């Protein structure tokens, strides 16, 4: 029990240190070029934390949802191709505009042991450009875009920056963070995974909060809209949508 409490205490202290490191990372990003775009929060890469749902960045609401997409390597590859070319957003009714590659700067994330204790920052790995069969470039580190989100009779602009990409043999995905003028502040991550039993799953993780005073006043409405969008996201890679 003492060992478990010590591990949790170390994790919380590391998270506080990481929040401070995230603030420094954010400041570095803010010194980047206009093309790169600056994120509007400090805990960059926080969606990789194993204990996100229990210890989210202060003031933010966490979320994690997973849906099964089917099974087998072919289903995995099909889902990955859609995920990494903005398929989740487009199939959810969004328009993806103003896409720029950026410089490739990214947050490398935190490494954890089997008990969830943080070990430190992961080593940074360079990733070659990847393209889909139709020539569409895969989402890459530092890429920026503006999502056009339909909300009733209105369309909201949501500028984002890709802060990291996960490229493992059986787990692929990315996360983007909010930029200036995004209606919410925070980070959202999307992963497709091929499990040892052959199952293919799609997971969404995020932490967020309204970015404006008006948004905070209408917090329940904002969260309701986010739930609707999350439901669309989870359906976007289902086989029926991919056909």
Predicted regions: what they are:
Residues 65, 204-206, 233:
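A structural signal for short, well-ordered beta-strand segments
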Residues 31, 210-243:
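A conserved amphipathic terminal alpha-helix motif
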Residues 141-143, 170-176, 202-205:
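A short hydrophobic beta-strand element
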Residues 194-198, 203-209:
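Compact beta-sheet-dominated globular domain cores
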Residues 178-182, 205-212:
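Short, solvent-exposed aromatic-acidic interface loops
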Residues 148-196:
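Hydrophobic-ligand binding "helix-grip"
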Residues 77-88, 181, 197, 235, ...:
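Short, intrinsically disordered, mixed-charge
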Residues 2-146:
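Hydrophobic ligand-binding cavity/cleft-lining segments
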């Amino acid at each position: 029990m003492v060992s478990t409490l010590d591990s949790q205490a170390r994790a919380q202290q590391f998270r506080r240190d990481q929040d401070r490191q995230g603030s420094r990372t954010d400041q570095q990003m803010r010194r980047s070029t206009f093309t790169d775009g600056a994120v509007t929060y400090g805990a960059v890469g926080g969606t990789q934390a194993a204990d996100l749902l229990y210890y989210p960045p202060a003031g933010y609401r966490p979320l994690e949802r997973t849906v099964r997409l089917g099974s087998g390597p072919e289903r995995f590859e099909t889902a990955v191709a859609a995920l990494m070319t903005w398929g989740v957003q487009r199939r959810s009714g969004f328009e993806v505009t103003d896409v720029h590659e950026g410089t490739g700067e990214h947050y490398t994330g935190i490494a954890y042991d089997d008990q969830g204790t943080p070990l430190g920052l992961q080593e940074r790995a360079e990733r070659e450009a990847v393209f889909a069969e139709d020539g569409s470039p895969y989402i890459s580190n530092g890429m920026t875009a503006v999502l056009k989100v339909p909300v009733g009779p209105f369309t909201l602009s949501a500028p984002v920056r890709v802060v990291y990409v996960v490229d493992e043999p059986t787990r692929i995905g990315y996360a983007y963070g909010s930029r200036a003028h995004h209606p919410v502040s925070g980070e959202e991550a999307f992963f497709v995974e091929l499990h040892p039993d052959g199952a293919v799953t799609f997971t969404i993780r995020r932490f967020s909060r309204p970015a404006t005073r008006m948004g905070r006043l209408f917090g329940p409405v904002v969260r309701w809209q986010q739930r609707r969008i999350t439901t669309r996201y989870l359906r976007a890679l289902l086989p029926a949508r991919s056909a």
